[in-house]
């Protein structure tokens, strides 16, 4: 099996509401795939199911050929391999930027303080924040907080990075610095599954774009193909609305 990630007929309900209705797709190493769709279409739920923050009701998810949805799956090992960057940063307010990054390295990977610090500083430098290593989250802008979140995920050396609307909580002028880091990661070959409506990033960096609606993948394809020649009316209307909301500049 050559796929890094394979999602096979995944269903998820919350009470009587079925949020994921038989989602299936695959990703190869180095792919940067983006999930788009209206609010409530299941995008974030799909991400959370991949690293077991949310449990699926049925179906299977494979990472590197291994079924990671079985009861005996080592969830901590899964989360070492699948990093996640959250919409609201999820940083510990009482820890510095550096310590937010080293925490997982020490607690999960069991590294000593010096090893963890070396890796953390390398990743903070990678996202342009080494100078802020001793700053606390309250002293950082939203864009800086999100870049710390990315550094924290990268420090675990994951096979796959999940991004759940990483720019939606940011002031508009701070979006660019986060998108730039994501674009750099894409160009370096990081495998990424992203929920985002940042169309500039989608057009320039995405391998494929998946359009979700009502818990299903309506259409999948290269961004250029979907923007220029969508097969489904639902795709066309959604993307037209998205372009209008973002000023039509893509």
Residue ranges and their predicted role:
Residues 3-5, 11-214, 218-223:
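ABC family nucleotide-binding domain
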